A protein has these predicted regions:
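Conserved small/polar residues in nucleotide/adenosyl-binding loops
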Residues: 1-5
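Long, acidic (Asp/Glu-rich), low-complexity accessory segments flanking structured domains
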Residues: 6-10
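Solvent-exposed soluble domains appended to multi-pass membrane proteins
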Residues: 45-69, 73-76, 81-442
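Helix-hairpin-helix/helix-loop-helix acidic hairpins
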Residues: 11-66
Length: 442
């Protein structure tokens, strides 16, 4: 479907693996055109593909504009559930809140990478463009994001005010310029998070403190518009050998050998993330009671911690590829401070892990919020009922959770190829974008 490239999310690895000459040639090529053109692409075929979105049936009529809820989207650093790949036993329940939120959808999104690549996940979450067509880049560092279609531009088109925040340096992945290029009305970084609460010797602000500081920013947004706020957390970033063992609040009973200490510190971080979710939900519940503002929240992990491959049990999957999919499956939830009436539309009846590609999370969130949907978003939602995950490894996941290679099922191939056609029409250098595919339906 497309040619392979060598440049990964860590550019140093390319030079180490393939040598200076190959790395430099690849980098030069990517600077000229970082997006791979699908085989047999043409603009007319892309427009025709968008018509498949006509098959999508919304679970309910969209809300009227005055009833649009505030939208909160959180990318949670290294948020992962080791129950997916190992028989984890511990002295306490690690995610009692997240896995049992009332009035919510719970499942797993598939991260582009195992154990790293936050910006790749961030880009897929915000734009619903898959890294399949650009597997060798860090998006914010390579792509021109001005006038790019994203959930930011989409919600601004519906009248939303927009804000993005991250309690760490603004230079990571060029977020300071990338977020402004995407159109966020305001951005906040480390100096705006004044609580500066950390966990032991770890240098990263806790999720609890991050949410408290961010709530102040949220309340300062315009009151006369619906609000969209995007938050990238930092608390659970590696490494996981920074604290003295006496500070661990979770202790794994399972023997992980050399990774015992890392696992305890990591799980302690996840336990704290889970507790902070309850604090955030309590805050928005109180806000609804106080102001009547409706808020819907989606949160997903960006990737598993880097050591996941060292402790994963191969017997948890039938094939190596399915094990890698599990290692890339990060938890997500969608919750609201008002009744969600159509959670069944976002819940798989055949995959107990309720998995979807990261590019499908935002369309699913907007669906649950009752907002008008573009043809692009509708295509992804309809595609989710056929092949919920497509990967850069030339395979995809079926609705029952099993995987297959491209070419094995022509009907599923058509969905995947159609999606890549639409994506290239959106961002490809040799495509003439049909903006009507990506704008809200009239």
């Amino acid at each position: 479907m497309y040619k392979r490239q060598t440049y990964g999310w860590a550019w140093q690895n390319t030079y180490y693996t393939y040598g200076y000459l190959a790395g430099t040639i690849e980098a030069t090529s990517l600077m000229a055109d970082p997006v791979i053109e699908p085989e047999n692409y043409n603009d007319a075929a892309a427009v025709n593909t968008a018509r498949k979105a006509d098959d999508y049936t919304a679970p309910a009529s969209p809300e009227s504009a005055e009833d649009y809820p505030d939208i909160v989207l959180i990318l949670s650093e290294s948020f992962y559930d080791f129950d997916l790949v190992t028989d984890l036993q511990a002295d306490t329940d690690i995610m009692p809140v997240t896995k049992n939120l009332p009035n919510s959808v719970y499942g797993h999104t598939i991260s582009p990478h195992v154990g790293g690549g936050t910006n790749s996940t961030e880009y897929e979450m915000l734009t619903s463009n898959s890294l399949i067509l650009m597997p060798s880049i860090t998006p914010f560092n390579w792509l021109n994001l001005y006038n790019a279609n994203s959930v930011v531009s989409y919600l601004k088109g519906l009248g939303y005010s927009t804000m993005a925040a991250h309690p760490y340096t603004n230079s990571n992945y060029r977020r300071d310029s990338a977020w402004l290029a995407l159109g966020f009305d305001e951005t906040h970084f480390q100096s705006d998070f004044t609580t500066q609460e950390t966990y032991g010797d770890r240098p990263y602000q806790t999720d609890s403190a991050t949410y408290r500081d961010w709530e102040t920013m949220y309340e300062a947004m315009p009151e006369d518009k619906p609000r969209f706020s995007f938050l990238v957390s930092i608390q659970s970033h590696g490494d996981y050998d920074m604290n003295d063992a006496s500070l661990d609040i979770v202790h794994a009973a399972t023997d992980y050998g050399d990774y015992d200490a890392l696992m305890d510190e990591y799980l302690s971080c996840i336990k704290m993330t889970d507790a902070a979710v309850q604090e955030l939900c309590d805050y928005f519940t109180a806000q609804y009671e106080k102001t009547g503002r409706k808020v819907i929240v989606a949160m997903a992990g960006d990737h598993a911690p880097s050591f996941v491959g060292h402790v994963a049990d191969p017997s948890f999957a039938e094939t190596d590829n399915e094990l890698q999919i599990l290692e890339r499956s990060t938890p997500f939830f969608i919750w609201a401070n008002y009744p969600l009436e159509h959670t069944a539309a976002a819940t798989s009846t055949t995959d107990p892990l309720n998995r979807m590609d990261m590019v499908m999370l935002t369309p699913t969130l907007l669906q649950q919020a009752g907002l008008p949907l573009s043809d692009y978003y509708e295509y992804l939602l309809e595609m989710k009922h056929n092949t919920p995950v497509v990967t850069a490894a030339n395979d995809y996941m079926k609705v029952d959770g099993s995987t297959a290679e491209y070419g094995a099922d022509p009907a599923l191939d058509e969905w995947a190829k159609g999606y890549l056609m639409l994506e290239y029409n959106n961002i490809g250098a040799h495509a003439k974008r049909d903006q009507s595919i990506f704008d809200p339906a009239e």
